Amino acid sequence: MIRKFLIVLIIAYQRYISPFTAPSCRFYPSCSEYARQSLIKYGLIKGVVKTCGRLCRCHPFHPGGYDPV
C-alpha cells in the first residue's frame, strides 16, 4: 500500500513538476524513474534503500552515466 502510494507520488512528480525544472540528473534513467522502477522491482524496503543510494551518488562531482535498476 505504501509502495503504491510512493509510486503514485513519483509519477505525479514526473508529470507535473519535473517538466518545469531544469534537467539536473546525471544518470540514465533519471533518479525519479530509477526510484519508480526499484520500488516496482524490489519492493518497499529494498527499493527505498537503493533509491537513497542513487540519490547520494547524484551530485556534480560524480560522472553519472547509465545506471540500470
Curated annotation (Swiss-Prot):
It comes from Syntrophotalea carbinolica (strain DSM 2380 / NBRC 103641 / GraBd1) (Pelobacter carbinolicus). It is a peripheral membrane protein. Could be involved in insertion of integral membrane proteins into the membrane. Signal peptide: none annotated. The keyword Transmembrane helix does not apply. NCBIfam families: membrane protein insertion efficiency factor YidD (TIGR00278). The keyword Metal-binding does not apply. Keywords: Cell inner membrane, Cell membrane, Membrane. It holds the Pfam family YidD. Transmembrane segments: none annotated. GO terms for cellular component: plasma membrane. SMART domains: Haemolytic. It is found in: Cell inner membrane. Belongs to the UPF0161 family. Its main location: membrane. This is Putative membrane protein insertion efficiency factor.
